[in-house]
C-alpha cells in the first residue's frame, strides 16, 4: 500500500472531521472568542461552531510573535468513552471522543478561597455526558489549579477510559518543535531521587515528520508509589519564544502526561499539546463505569507559564506551593531541627541502652525533635518488617517501658516522635491473620502481598478507625508529637475488590488515605507528620498538602546527597524538605561539616552517631545547628531556589554542586567540592561574599568580575556562602 494513500485514509486525515479548526469558514458562526485573565496569566479560548477550543496559556501581557505557533485542535478537555471512535489511531490521548465533539454550554466565574475560579461547562448530545472544567487561580502566583468533572446525565452507563485534568496547547510549532522545545523532567528512584534532565522531544520518542506524529513524549507512574520512576511534574521550554510551561500533578497514586502534536487542517500537524492527568485505563488499569446520575472527578493538576526557563518555572511553583498547597501548621515557619535515630545510626535496632546516650547527644547538639525509627515495636529476635501492624512497644527493647525513654526526650526539651508504617500489615502479623480480606487491597481474589507486607484498604472505615486508635494511643500515652509515616511498598495497579477496575479501586483508596490524614490533623493540629516512601518514593503534593515534612532519600553515602537535595528543591518546598546530616562515628570535621551544609538550606534531619564522634566533629555539628537556628531558618519559608551550576548528576563524583536560596534581603549558596578541582567558580556577582559555615576549616571565597570563586583546601568539603 502506498504510504500517502494509507495516511490519507486513516485516522490522521480523519482528525479534521473530529476536530474542526477554530474559526474555519466551513463552520457556522459560533460564540465570540474570550480570554480569562489572572494578574499573572491569560487563557485564551476560541470556538469551532459551538465547540470550545483552548487556544493558549501565556504570561499576562505577553505578545506572541507573528511567527509563533498557531492553535489548531485545542480541545479544552480530552475524554474518551468505551465504544466511541477514537480520533487517534495509536496510543495518544490528546483528543478522545466525545472530547472532540463536546458542545460548549456556559462559563461561570466566582471568588474561591485565595483567588478566583472559572468553570466551563460542556455537554455531549450523543452520550448525554456533561463535563465541567475548573480553573482555580491564586493571588500573586502565575499558576492555576485545574481539574475536570464528568457527569452522566443520560440513561445508560458510560465507560470512561481517560479524562484529562488539563490540556495545554500551542507549546511549539507543529513541525519544528524539535529545534525549539526542551522537555525538563526528573527521574526518581530509590536513593537517587530528583535527577533532572533536559531532552529534545525526539529523545523521548516524539519525532518530527511532515504530518501528525503517532508517538508522544510521556511519563507516568503506576501504583501507590507516585514517584517511583519520575516526579509528577515537568516543564516544556520554548527557547525561541523564551517561555516555559510547567505542571505539577497533585496525586498520591497513578498519573500520566504526554506531549505530542495534532492537525486540524489536512494532515499537517499545527499544534503541540500536553495532556495532563491521573490514572486512566491504558496506563494504569483505571477504567471507570459511570452510572446514570453519577459523576467522576479527575485529579488536580497545577499549570502555569512564565517568561524564562527552568529556574523561573521552579520559582513560580515554589510560590504556588506556599500559597495553595501547604496546610497551616505552627512548624511551617519554625523549621524545627529533627533528630532521627535510623540513618548511619541505630538502623532499625533501637533499645533503651542505645537510645539514652543518643538522646543526650542530640539534645546537646541543639535538636528539637527526637524520633525513634523502625523496630521499636518488634522483639529483639523478630524481623520487624514482617510483623508490623499492632504498634505496641516491645518489652525486651524497653525494660523500663518506652514511656521511660520518651520521658527522657521531653526532660531534655525535645518533642518525642515514632516511626510508623500505618498503611500495611506484615505478612506474619497478628493483624493480617485476624482481619478479613475487606481490610486489604485484593487483586484476582488474592491479597496483594509486596515486600512481606499486605496493603490496607483505606476505603474500609474499619481500617481507618483502627489506625485512629493507634494514633490516639501514641499521642495520649507517650506524648508523641511527630510521626514518621513510612511506606515501603508499591501497590502497582491497585485493587479490584468492590471496584470497577484495579486502578479505580486504587484511586478511591488514595483519596480515602488523604481524607484520613486530614481528619488526623484536625484532631491533632500540632502533630508533625513526615511523608516518607522509602525516602522520596511518594514525593507528591497530594501528600505534601497534608503532611508537614518530606523525607528526601534513603541514600547512605553523604557525597551523593548534594545532587539529590538540589534536584529535590525544584519539587518540594525547602521548609518541607528534610535532608540527612548523618556523620559516622569516625567522621572528621570536614566530613561532619559537609553533612551539615547539605541540610542547612532546607530542614535538618540530623542522625549519625553523635554519641561517639570526636569533639572536633561534634563541634561542627553543634555550630552548624546553632547557625541554622539563629541565622538561616528564619529565611527558609520565603526562600526561592536557584542553580548557579545547573542541575547535578548523582552519578558524577567529580563535578561540584551548588544550590542557592534567595529570600528578601538574604541570599545564600551551598557549595560542595567532590573529587574535582580545588576552586569552584560560580557565575555570581558577589563582591561582599563571605563564608558563613564552616568558618574555621580554611575555605576561602573571592568575588570578582561577576564570578564567585570558592577555594577548598581539601576534596570532599562543603560550605555555605552568604552573598
Model-derived regions: residue spans:
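Polysaccharide-binding surfaces and accessory modules of carbohydrate-active proteins
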Residues: 30-268, 284, 696-701
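Glycine-rich, aromatic-flanked loop segments that form ligand/cofactor-binding clefts
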Residues: 83, 87-88, 94, 98-99, ...
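Short Pro-Gly-centered flexible turn/kink motifs
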Residues: 288-307, 716-722
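N-terminal export signals
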Residues: 5-25
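Aromatic-lined carbohydrate-binding/catalytic grooves of carbohydrate-active enzymes
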Residues: 332-466, 482
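C-terminal beta-strand-rich structural cap/linker in extracellular carbohydrate-active enzymes
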Residues: 702-723
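Active-site neighborhood of glycoside hydrolase catalytic domains
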Residues: 442-586, 612
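Carbohydrate-binding surface patches
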Residues: 648-687, 716
Amino acid at each position: 500500500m502506498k504510504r500517502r494513500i494509507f495516511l490519507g485514509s486513516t485516522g490522521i486525515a480523519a482528525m479534521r472531521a473530529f476536530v474542526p479548526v477554530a474559526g474555519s469558514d466551513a463552520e457556522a458562526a459560533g460564540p465570540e472568542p474570550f480570554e480569562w485573565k489572572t494578574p499573572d496569566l491569560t487563557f485564551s479560548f476560541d470556538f469551532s461552531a459551538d465547540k470550545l477550543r483552548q487556544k493558549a496559556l501565556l504570561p499576562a501581557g505577553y505578545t506572541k510573535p507573528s511567527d509563533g505557533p498557531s492553535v489548531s485542535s485545542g480541545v479544552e478537555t480530552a475524554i474518551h468513552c468505551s465504544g466511541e471512535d477514537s480520533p487517534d489511531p495509536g496510543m495518544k490521548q490528546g483528543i478522545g471522543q466525545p472530547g472532540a465533539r463536546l458542545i460548549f454550554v456556559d462559563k461561570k466565574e466566582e471568588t474561591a478561597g485565595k483567588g478566583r475560579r472559572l468553570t466551563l461547562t460542556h455537554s455531549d448530545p450523543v452520550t448525554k455526558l456533561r463535563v465541567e472544567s475548573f480553573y482555580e487561580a491564586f493571588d500573586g502566583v502565575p499558576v492555576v489549579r485545574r481539574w475536570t468533572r464528568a457527569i452522566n446525565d443520560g440513561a445508560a452507563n458510560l465507560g470512561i477510559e481517560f479524562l484529562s485534568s488539563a490540556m495545554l496547547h500551542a507549546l511549539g510549532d507543529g513541525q519544528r518543535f524539535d529545534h525549539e522545545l526542551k522537555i525538563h523532567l526528573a527521574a526518581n528512584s530509590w536513593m537517587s531521587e530528583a535527577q533532572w534532565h533536559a531532552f529534545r522531544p525526539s529523545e523521548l520518542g516524539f519525532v518530527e515528520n511532515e504530518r501528525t506524529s503517532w508517538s508522544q513524549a510521556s511519563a507516568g507512574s503506576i501504583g501507590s508509589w507516585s514517584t517511583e520512576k519520575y516526579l509528577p511534574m515537568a516543564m516544556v521550554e520554548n527557547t525561541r519564544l523564551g517561555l516555559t510551561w510547567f505542571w505539577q500533578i497533585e496525586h498520591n497514586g497513578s498519573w500520566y502526561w504526554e506531549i505530542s502534536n495534532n492537525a486540524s487542517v489536512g494532515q499537517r500537524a499545527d499544534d503541540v499539546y500536553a495532556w495532563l492527568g491521573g490514572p486512566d485505563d491504558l496506563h494504569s488499569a483505571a477504567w471507570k463505569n459511570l452510572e446514570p446520575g453519577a459523576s467522576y472527578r479527575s485529579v488536580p493538576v497545577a499549570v502555569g507559564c512564565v517568561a524564562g526557563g527552568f529556574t523561573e518555572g521552579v520559582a513560580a511553583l515554589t510560590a504556588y506551593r506556599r500559597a495553595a498547597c501547604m496546610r497551616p501548621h505552627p512548624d511551617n515557619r519554625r523549621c524545627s531541627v529533627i533528630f532521627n535515630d535510623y540513618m548511619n545510626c541505630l538502623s532499625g535496632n533501637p533499645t533503651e541502652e542505645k537510645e539514652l546516650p543518643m538522646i543526650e547527644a542530640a539534645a546537646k547538639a541543639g535538636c528539637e525533635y527526637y524520633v525513634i525509627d523502625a523496630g521499636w515495636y518488634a522483639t529483639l529476635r523478630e524481623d520487624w518488617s514482617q510483623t508490623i501492624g499492632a504498634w505496641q512497644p516491645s518489652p525486651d527493647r524497653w525494660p523500663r517501658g518506652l514511656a521511660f525513654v520518651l520521658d527522657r526526650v521531653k526532660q531534655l526539651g525535645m518533642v518525642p516522635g515514632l516511626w510508623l508504617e500505618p498503611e500495611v500489615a506484615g505478612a506474619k502479623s497478628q493483624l493480617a491473620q485476624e482481619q478479613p480480606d475487606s481490610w486489604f487491597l485484593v487483586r484476582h481474589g488474592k491479597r496483594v502481598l509486596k515486600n512481606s507486607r499486605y496493603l490496607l484498604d483505606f476505603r474500609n472505615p474499619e481500617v481507618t478507625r483502627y489506625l485512629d486508635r493507634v494514633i490516639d494511643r501514641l499521642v495520649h500515652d507517650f506524648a508523641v508529637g511527630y510521626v514518621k509515616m513510612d511506606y515501603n511498598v508499591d501497590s502497582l495497579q491497585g485493587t479490584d475488590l468492590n471496584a470497577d477496575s484495579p486502578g479505580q479501586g486504587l484511586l478511591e483508596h488514595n483519596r480515602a488515605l488523604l481524607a484520613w490524614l486530614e481528619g488526623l490533623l484536625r484532631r491533632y493540629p500540632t502533630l508533625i507528620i513526615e511523608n516518607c516512601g522509602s525516602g522520596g518514593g511518594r514525593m507528591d503534593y497530594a501528600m505534601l498538602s497534608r503532611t508537614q515534612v518530606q523525607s528526601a532519600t534513603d541514600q547512605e553515602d553523604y557525597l551523593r546527597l548534594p545532587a539529590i537535595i538540589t534536584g529535590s528543591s525544584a519539587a518540594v518546598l525547602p521548609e518541607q524538605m528534610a535532608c540527612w546530616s548523618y556523620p559516622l562515628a569516625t567522621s572528621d570535621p570536614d566530613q561532619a561539616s559537609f553533612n551539615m551544609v547539605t541540610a542547612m538550606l532546607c530542614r535538618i534531619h540530623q542522625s549519625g552517631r553523635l554519641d561517639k564522634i570526636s569533639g572536633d566533629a561534634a563541634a561542627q555539628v553543634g555550630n552548624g545547628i546553632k547557625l541554622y537556628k539563629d541565622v538561616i531558618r528564619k529565611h527558609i519559608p520565603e526562600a526561592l531556589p536557584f542553580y548557579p551550576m545547573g542541575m547535578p548528576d548523582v552519578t558524577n563524583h567529580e563535578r561540584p554542586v551548588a544550590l542557592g536560596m534567595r529570600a528578601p534581603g538574604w541570599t545564600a549558596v551551598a557549595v560542595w567540592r567532590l573529587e574535582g578541582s580545588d576552586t569552584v567558580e560560580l557565575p555570581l556577582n558577589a563582591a561582599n561574599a563571605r563564608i558563613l559555615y564552616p568558618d574555621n576549616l580554611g575555605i576561602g571565597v573571592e568575588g570578582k568580575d561577576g564570578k564567585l570563586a570558592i577555594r577548598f583546601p581539601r576534596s570532599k568539603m562543603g560550605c555555605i556562602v552568604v552573598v
